[in-house]
Amino acid sequence: MSISDPIADMLTRIRNAQAVQKPVVLMPSSKVKVAIAKVLQDEGYIESFEIKGEAAKPVLHIDLKYYAGRPVIERIDRVSTPSLRIYKGRHDIPEVMNGLGIAIISTPQGVMTDRKARATGVGGEVICYVA
């Protein structure tokens, strides 16, 4: 079965797994999904991630993070979709929850947080908001 929006599928899998307190979530891997997982790990929203399986069909394993029995990720929302891409210039990059959350942005220099994009002086496609 073909998935029309693999990034939205990734975010939904994470959201659903955390709703039922799963320790690990599995999904088909891609370069963009790995880059998003790297940002989530660097920002402390997930414990770790790794790619397993054969080269033809790699599987991304994400170890979810909980604090006092509650998921660390309170909200994770898709912003830019395949049918409606949302691009922001370097001066228009949004702040999520007044700086308490992050926006994950795909820039020409790679996938990064809103803070790093502002510091680097680049804009790009706003993939999702995480809080």
From Swiss-Prot:
InterPro entries (alphabetical): Ribosomal_uS8 (IPR000630), Ribosomal_uS8_CS (IPR047863), Ribosomal_uS8_sf (IPR035987)
GO cellular component, as recorded: ribonucleoprotein complex; ribosome
GO term, biological process aspect, one: translation
Listed GO MF terms: rRNA binding; structural constituent of ribosome
Keyword vocabulary terms for this entry: Ribonucleoprotein, Ribosomal protein, RNA-binding, rRNA-binding
Highest taxon of source: Bacteria
NCBIfam families: PRK00136.1 (NF001109)
Quaternary structure and interacting proteins, as annotated: Part of the 30S ribosomal subunit. Contacts proteins S5 and S12.
Function, in words: One of the primary rRNA binding proteins, it binds directly to 16S rRNA central domain where it helps coordinate assembly of the platform of the 30S subunit.
Family to which the UniProt record says this protein belongs: Belongs to the universal ribosomal protein uS8 family.
HAMAP family, per the entry: Ribosomal_uS8_B (MF_01302_B)
Protein name: Small ribosomal subunit protein uS8
Organism the protein comes from: Polynucleobacter asymbioticus (strain DSM 18221 / CIP 109841 / QLW-P1DMWA-1)
